């Protein structure tokens, strides 16, 4: 089977560690999300930060091919990359912009979620110079404490924004801070937003992230913003049975050693063998995005069995105990994240061991790690990102 390449990407021609992305699972998760929302509701698929580490362009193309209406991004650089890749769908920058970016944002026909009058002014001025209308979504800070207009100042600021002649207000939105964990706090934010709905005379609303989508159906308004669930990672444990993770991270055994009882493993001698052991050295480390905090905690899958990580994870290598797998040899595959046989290692599992969140686990996978895309309908052939 031939492979499509992306010349702008630089990946090892002979990778020792790589990621496989399953297009079938991605489409399955899109269908699951569609089943949760009314037919009129549009999806804003969040593809910022390289589509949560999965690869911006291939994921975006597959989402558009699958009917997703809007792509949510971090900044103008991502917008330019998408436009240059031939994607003409609606784009929405979710984060604050700088004044120097306003002109190019308007020229590329990109919407912006704004949290200040200044952003609105910069965009309106740029749009006026170009004879266009700048597209904005107005965010209200109902409890997140990050972006959005403060409710007590909102009406005053909006009166100023409405006087900007080259601005098109496309929607009103907010962002839930505790949709995964606190139903009451989420409902409080929702009710805070509704206080201002009359002010917009029927403008579209979006509030729901992946977690909120499964909290209450009323949160699925005119748009829903879905990120984590698209990639098959459950924002809440009960959702795991509904979603399919689309990413598998693999590497290879590069060395096998027989070591005696009491032998130290890796920097700092943080682990000493409790018995004579067979140790495999794997071709991945924290320099590739595999968290050092997983040292002496995580396992990897080899031949469908869990093999514990021993010692400190190093920049490009880690060690695992394969004493119970005598048939292992150099070159065998190891699964760092994903399924092999009947065993699975999830992003949630690694996040818990690292005392972080699943978002960080997947976005940490370094951009130099080769991504192989399988069963993607937006491309005629299996494609692999490499030089």
Curated annotation (Swiss-Prot):
Keywords: Isomerase, Pyridoxal phosphate. The active site is at 48 (proton acceptor), 267 (proton acceptor). Its EC number is 5.1.1.1. The modification N6-(pyridoxal phosphate)lysine is found at residue 48. One of its GO terms (biological process) is D-alanine biosynthetic process. Substrate binds at residues 146, 315. It comes from the Bacteria. Catalyzes the interconversion of L-alanine and D-alanine. May also act on other amino acids. This is Alanine racemase.
